[in-house]
Amino acid sequence: MSFDLCTIDWTAIGSIVTFVAMIIAYWTIHISDKQNKSNQRLQLLLVQRDIEQKRLDELVENIMIINDSMQPIVVTDYSVKLINGIFTEDDRHFIDEMAANDLANNNRLSVQLIKYDRKESAKKVLMTLSNMRRKYGEWIRNLSILNLYKSSFVISPQDLNRMILTMVQISKEIAPEYKKDIDYVIKTKDNDLNKAINLMNIFCYVISTYLNEQKKIFEEELYAFVKEEQKRIDNIVFHDSIK
């Protein structure tokens, strides 16, 4: 078979070649566009993961600051010092510093509760911590008030009475088994200062025991929460990128 170049329709062949070239060009652009979109999605997922990781790290850091500030041994030691009349000026300054830190921790905790109000797993951990901090804060305030009243009588009897009522309420709430001992102190004919000192003896033990028990529960809850959150964050890129 022989071909006559003059009889070949070069225009038709040129159209076919152009069409094929257009298909190749379109496919190349399509693949490139798909890769670009995939890369963009990957970048967005990486940014999302970094943001989530920073949020978790910030939350855990704030939680640990608050948790570490509440030491049961401190509650016992400084209460015993005050009860036994060996509370020094340095001790007073230390308690004042603790009170300032507790106020800062309360504000820090309030911010975290606002941020995680809609996230139940985080909120559960924060509420456990909040309950501990509230009772620990009451101990700090009561110890400060009792020291002021004992050393200089600079607070009113009404404030002293409110402090007594607070210690009674919290002690019975946490450790109802001490109700009989608490009622015995209240019914004695001692003055309010001596009643408050005797109640502090019970109150400090109740608070320190409560903190020891709650810290174990809290730390288990925190560990479980962080484990699940970290797993979720680590899977952001892997699971979402293959969808």
List the predicted regions and their residue ranges.
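Membrane-embedded hydrophobic alpha-helical segments
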Residues: M1-L46
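Intrinsically disordered, low-complexity regions of eukaryotic proteins
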Residues: C6, T11, H93, M98-A99, ...
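Short, solvent-exposed segments of well-ordered alpha helices
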Residues: T7, N39, Q43-E61, K119, ...
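Structured catalytic/translocation cores of nucleotide/phosphate-coupled proteins
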Residues: S15, M22, D57, H239-K243
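Intrinsically disordered, low-complexity serine/threonine-rich segments
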Residues: T18-I24, P72, V154-I164
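Amphipathic, membrane-active segments
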Residues: K37-D91
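An amphipathic alpha-helical interaction surface
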Residues: E97-K243
